[in-house]
Amino acid sequence: MLHLLALFLHCLPLASGDYDICKSWVTTDEGPTWEFYACQPKVMRLKDYVKVKVEPSGITCGDPPERFCSHENPYLCSNECDASNPDLAHPPRLMFDKEEEGLATYWQSITWSRYPSPLEANITLSWNKTVELTDDVVMTFEYGRPTVMVLEKSLDNGRTWQPYQFYAEDCMEAFGMSARRARDMSSSSAHRVLCTEEYSRWAGSKKEKHVRFEVRDRFAIFAGPDLRNMDNLYTRLESAKGLKEFFTLTDLRMRLLRPALGGTYVQRENLYKYFYAISNIEVIGRCKCNLHANLCSMREGSLQCECEHNTTGPDCGKCKKNFRTRSWRAGSYLPLPHGSPNACATAGSFGNCECYGHSNRCSYIDFLNVVTCVSCKHNTRGQHCQHCRLGYYRNGSAELDDENVCIECNCNQIGSVHDRCNETGFCECREGAAGPKCDDCLPTHYWRQGCYPNVCDDDQLLCQNGGTCLQNQRCACPRGYTGVRCEQPRCDPADDDGGLDCDRAPGAAPRPATLLGCLLLLGLAARLGR
């Protein structure tokens, strides 16, 4: 009977844009089967599942007992905070309790009695689960809102933090930022972090209590002021980079940096009126299940998705065993109105194993949670055989499933650094080499089983003394000259006695040794003539 009831509920008509049904029993030509849809859990009050932590230790009032007063009656300090007295204590849990009408219960910090040392507090809300905000975060302060505050979020259970929104009565002075309002942002800036002055200026502690992180104003940029065009919002959540992730978190942290001052400067004569007091923190959202579940419940002390589509894990972030023929993928809101489930599939559900026809075998890598192709053919490689092997490049005129999708680089072994090339087929050349395959030389080099710098040319490396440059490799020097570029006179043996005859070009000055020999001969001839 219960099985029939469950089947009946799954067969109810699908509500457009709600994404509240994960599967439906349908009849096909091959018989009845389940049809899957993208789905998500219902919105809930996340504060009912939160764990709160207040830092630093000793920031909560009452230990030891302490007097305090309000800004309205700053000199009537008859109020007392005493942690040992339940009627006078203000522990952190009172930020999330159910209050009777007309009676506010609240957490309260110590007063600023140690001024000028800063009065700062961190309030961390943790869910140990990835959640998505669907409405404004509303923080209610008794006795005045902080004049400086930062709201931060974490995506990794509090290991790292990033700013979510800045709050100050003067944004430029506090954070060096211009003040902005969420309602004035554009579609391209809806996920940017801003500083607002809207919730920090003094308006009387009993008049303005709320501090907001505006989710609805950001949604309204896409869905309209009444949030009626949800189809457009879902479309933008899928298509706008970073938008969906902006509303996703595991933890929130309020960094209270300066308390309410009552619209004036700090008055040193009465520091008991400066403190923080929070009566409520409202967080509306849903479990993030990657559009693979419509139910989320407390199990083993934390929220967990009740996964469909053959997925598993706290966020339905993995495929079940025996359903790993293809890599896990999150569901999608598109196409409207039911989205794409991207369900994990059993073995044999996909004949080509998503390898573009270059392999018919796949393997599941557990620690990476991916399915990868094995033994890619046609010189391909990669998770889906979508890349070319080293030494090959993509054929731009061929489709990914073409056997000739990868072309060999054919780099010249001597002129190239290695046998690999870039995506256009150009090889990495050694010094002096050029050309797509490195089989040519730069104009300043010549080829001889590799590229070598020119010895001579007709431009800058000229052969001297009438020499002729032969193929940029050497200078052919005229009689009487030698050297790389014919820059040195040549000396040859002159007789059998080992003397040297240094030829010189016409008009060249005689060498000193030759001149000395001539003088000696002239002297000898003069003596003989006597």
Swiss-Prot record:
GO terms for biological process: axonogenesis; modulation of chemical synaptic transmission; postsynaptic specialization assembly; regulation of neuron migration; regulation of neuron projection arborization; regulation of neuron projection development; regulation of presynapse assembly; synaptic membrane adhesion. N-glycosylated. A lipid is attached at residue 507 (GPI-anchor amidated glycine). Changing residue 359 to C: In NEDBASH; highly decreased cell surface expression. Transmembrane segments: none annotated. Changing residue 200 to L: In NEDBASH; almost abolished cell surface expression. Its main location: membrane. InterPro entries: EGF-like_dom (IPR000742), Laminin/Netrin_ECM (IPR050440), Laminin_N (IPR008211), LE_dom (IPR002049), LMN_ATRN_NET-like_EGF (IPR056863). Residues 287-346, 353-408, 409-453 form the Laminin EGF-like domain. Disulfide bonds join 22-39, 61-81, 69-77, 171-195, 287-296, 289-305, 307-316, 319-344, 353-362, 355-373, 376-385, 388-406, 409-421, 411-427, 429-438, 441-451, 456-469, 463-475, 477-486. GO terms for cellular component: axon; extracellular region; glutamatergic synapse; plasma membrane; presynaptic active zone membrane; Schaffer collateral - CA1 synapse; side of membrane. It is a lipid-anchor; GPI-anchor. Residues 201-203 are annotated as: NGL discriminant loop II. The laminin N-terminal domain mediates 1:1 binding to NGL ligand with sub-micromolar affinity. Three NGL-binding loops mediate discrimination for LRRC4C/NGL1 among other NGLs by binding specifically to its LRR repeats. This specificity drives the sorting of a mixed population of molecules into discrete cell surface subdomains. Involved in controlling patterning and neuronal circuit formation at the laminar, cellular, subcellular and synaptic levels. Promotes neurite outgrowth of both axons and dendrites. It is linked to Neurodevelopmental disorder with behavioral abnormalities, absent speech, and hypotonia: An autosomal recessive disorder characterized by global developmental delay with severely impaired intellectual development, impaired motor development, axial and peripheral hypotonia, poor speech and significant behavioral abnormalities, including autism spectrum disorder, hyperactivity, mood disorders, aggression, hand and face stereotypies, sleep disturbances, anxiety, self-injurious behavior, and bruxism. Interacts with LRRC4. This is Netrin-G2. It comes from Homo sapiens. The lineage of its organism: Eukaryota, Metazoa, Chordata, Craniata, Vertebrata. The gene is NTNG2.
